[in-house]
């Protein structure tokens, strides 16, 4: 049995979980999230009120979906209680970010500024012109928008200029040596 999948998902106080067939809806202090669980996987509540994920048999696909479904449900519970935040940094001369309403405007050395719109449920916060954070209750949405922003100007291995996650280490390369 999946080591992750067999663990029940604890439901903290103040969180309401509704299970109807393959649909799991989690409502908490920060909002509501829903998830459609893949077909062979079954979701139920145990006597303690925790969420239990089970699979019908040990086929390879079912084993894979078992742990995945349990983790996605745990992410929903964490999202509606604590939320998710990703911090990012910008390195490079003249590179900066400015908040324009709920959107971000980047100056990244291109001939034009790059505008990123905040998707529903995601908020941006600019601490300094080179540091900003992305917050939301949906882990997948926060991670995807962070990856899209990072892709605007990936960090250069020679000079280290670009956008990166806070604390991310960039492998540096040695440049050409002159004669």
UniProtKB/Swiss-Prot annotation:
Q: Which UniProt keywords apply?
A: Ribonucleoprotein, Ribosomal protein, RNA-binding, rRNA-binding
**rRNA-binding as a keyword?**
yes
Q: Name one Pfam family in it.
A: Ribosomal_L6
The protein's matches in HAMAP family, at most eight in alphabetical order, are given as: Ribosomal_uL6_B
Query: What role is this protein assigned?
Result: This protein binds to the 23S rRNA, and is important in its secondary structure. It is located near the subunit interface in the base of the L7/L12 stalk, and near the tRNA binding site of the peptidyltransferase center.
Which protein family is named in the record? Belongs to the universal ribosomal protein uL6 family.
* Subunit (UniProt): Part of the 50S ribosomal subunit.
Question: What name does this protein carry?
Answer: Large ribosomal subunit protein uL6
| Lineage of the organism | Bacteria, Bacillati, Actinomycetota, Actinomycetes, Mycobacteriales
């Amino acid at each position: 049995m999946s080591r992750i999948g067999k663990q029940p998902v604890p439901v903290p106080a103040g969180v309401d979980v509704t299970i109807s067939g393959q649909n799991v809806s989690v409502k908490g202090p920060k909002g509501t999230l829903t998830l459609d669980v893949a077909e062979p996987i079954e979701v139920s509540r145990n006597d303690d009120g925790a969420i239990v994920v089970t699979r019908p048999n040990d086929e390879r696909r079912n084993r894979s979906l078992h742990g995945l479904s349990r983790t996605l449900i745990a992410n929903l519970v964490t999202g509606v209680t604590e939320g998710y935040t990703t911090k990012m940094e910008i390195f490079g001369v003249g590179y900066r970010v400015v908040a324009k309403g709920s959107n971000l405007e980047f100056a990244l050395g291109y001939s034009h500024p790059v505008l990123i719109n905040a998707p529903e449920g995601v908020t941006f916060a600019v601490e300094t012109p080179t540091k900003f954070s992305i917050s939301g209750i949906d882990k997948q949405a926060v991670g995807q928008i962070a990856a899209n922003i990072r892709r605007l100007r990936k960090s250069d291995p020679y000079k280290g200029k670009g956008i990166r996650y806070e604390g991310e280490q960039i492998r540096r390369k040695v440049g050409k040596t002159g004669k």
